[in-house]
From Swiss-Prot:
Annotated protein name in UniProt: 3-isopropylmalate dehydratase large subunit
Annotated EC: 4.2.1.33
SUBUNIT field: Heterodimer of LeuC and LeuD.
The reaction(s) this protein catalyses: (2R,3S)-3-isopropylmalate = (2S)-2-isopropylmalate
Chain sites annotated for binding [4Fe-4S] cluster: C363, C423, C426
Names of the cofactor(s): [4Fe-4S] cluster
Functional note: Catalyzes the isomerization between 2-isopropylmalate and 3-isopropylmalate, via the formation of 2-isopropylmaleate.
């Protein structure tokens, strides 16, 4: 954690993002040049790190701060047949090479790694928080788009490219220009049966997939304050789907309670000092954002996507839209293209869309709370005969906690597959893929063409909608059961 700047000496009103930025500036850029920002934590995985390590090696450089790097194996790992974590359990040669290379690099450069078979292994954006490595007020980067997940703790977290990964390895800094700030004010309270996934899908549908471009989004309001940390991570995770650089939620007692006692969290007097600093981070009253967007949380209902980007979504109670109803020519063309790929007819009730595969997994929605929500709906029920349901915990720790609660038995008895931890069907980079033409209801974060496998069609949903859909065989909410 970077030592805080004494804000009491300044009357300037700052947002959460501006405070974290201020406390990490090593040198201020002049004449339009970027600031040099200190990075508190870099997360690594097997896909975007090899070239960065090679860059260090070719330049004869050391890894400046191995202690501020944390690695895990997640993107390419299989989610079945894993017993020991041996490389021989990975059948795909390219995936095996990437995992092997990560292990070799971490050993050579002294980076802490949690490999397959380790109880602390899992998707990188679950591993950081569960270890207590993710803390309020930090700057966190990773060669992965959904690094914004960690913003749920009041950290400024964002994805970077491989050349930037190497830069952080070599210097523990990044040259960056300050981001703009946007407040997402969620008024009212979420109704029973409405989740943080429904909320973030509704936000993206409102502002668009480019609406947050260049901004850090700060999610605010009583509805946000009442969310658990698992739910907050879901919201911040998908900030990138609105085009934002990062998403943040101010730390509070819910945050502190989550972090306290975890392996890498401060202890004793250091904990007290850290909490005192964290309490200074929330946006000052009277601070100005570059943009403010309001959304009525009390009016939301279960939300799903119908198209091929996360902004193409509607309440589950509605029907597939008609491209002719779009007033913007670009939106109209995008809708026409999406409906052709998704093989959907305008006017079809969303609840009548038949599903082949239900995927409960990813860094968006596969933490313990997500699994509990789905298991409660599936308890005593069976999934539809022609449905395949895959349940993939986001970490080995989450898997073990779920098994202690008996959730695995509920899923298996319902007819679902209970897998080991990994990114799995979120992306077509491992054995878990849709076949061409197959349609999924997925708790992941992206519904792009081919994202879950060539020709696969993806509808983004919440864990509750995923579970209800598995039972009914069509897009459904628990109220439909």
């Amino acid at each position: 954690m970077t030592s805080p700047v004494d804000a009491s000496s300044s009357k300037e009103k700052l947002t959460l993002a501006e405070k974290v930025w201020r406390d990490h500036v090593v040198s201020k850029g002049e004449n339009g040049e970027p600031d040099l920002l200190y990075i508190d934590l870099q997360l690594l995985h097997e896909v975007t790190s090899p070239q960065a390590f090679d860059g260090l090696r070719m330049a004869g450089r050391k890894l400046r701060r191995p202690d501020l790097h944390l690695a895990t194996e997640d993107h390419n790992v299989p989610t079945e047949g894993i017993k020991t974590g041996s490389l021989l359990e990975i059948n795909d040669q390219i995936s095996r090479l990437q995992v092997s290379t990560l292990r070799d690099n971490c050993k050579e450069f002294g980076v802490r790694l949690h490999p397959m078979g380790d109880v602390r292994q899992g998707i990188v954006h679950t591993v950081g928080p569960q270890l207590g490595a993710t803390q309020p007020g930090m700057t966190i980067v990773c060669g992965d788009s959904h690094t914004s997940t960690h913003g749920a703790f009041g950290a400024m977290a964002f994805g970077i490219g491989t050349s930037e990964v190497e830069h952080v390895m070599a210097t523990q800094t990044l040259p960056l220009k300050p981001f703009k700030t946007m407040a997402i004010e969620v008024t009212g309270e979420l109704q029973p049966g409405v989740s943080s996934k429904d909320l973030i899908l509704a936000i993206i549908a409102k502002i668009g997939t480019g609406g947050g471009q260049g901004y850090v989004l700060e999610y605010r309001g009583e509805a946000i304050r009442k969310l658990s940390m698992d739910a907050r991570m879901t919201i911040c995770n998908m900030s990138i789907e609105a085009g934002a650089r990062a998403g943040m939620i101010a730390p509070d007692e819910t945050t502190f309670e989550y972090v306290k006692g975890r392996e890498m969290a401060p202890t004793g007097a250091d904990w007290d000092e850290a909490v005192a600093y964290w309490k200074t981070l929330p946006t000052d009253e009277g601070a100005e954002f570059d943009k403010v967007v309001e959304i009525d949380g009390s009016s939301l209902t279960p939300f799903v996507t119908w198209g091929t980007n996360p902004g193409q979504g509607l309440p589950l109670s509605e029907s597939v839209p008609d491209p002719e109803d779009f007033t913007n020519d670009n939106d109209k063309a995008a809708a026409e293209k999406a409906l052709q790929y998704m093989d959907l007819t305008p006017g079809t009730p969303l609840r009548e869309i038949k599903i082949d595969t239900v995927f409960l997994g990813s860094c968006t929605n596969a933490r313990i709370e997500d699994l509990e929500i789905a298991a409660e709906i599936l308890k005593g029920r069976k999934i539809a005969d022609d449905i395949r349901m895959m349940v993939v915990p986001s970490s080995t720790w989450v898997k073990q906690e779920a098994e202690k609660l008996g959730l695995d038995k509920i899923f298996i008895e319902a007819g679902a597959e209970w897998r080991t931890a990994g990114c799995s069907m979120c992306l077509g980079m491992n054995p878990d893929q849709l076949k061409p033409g197959e349609r999924s209801a997925s708790t992941s974060n992206r519904n792009f063409e081919g994202r879950q496998g060539p020709g696969g069609r993806t509808h983004l949903v919440s864990p509750a909608v995923a579970a209800a859909t598995a039972v009914r065989g069509k897009l459904s909410s628990p109220a439909d059961l």
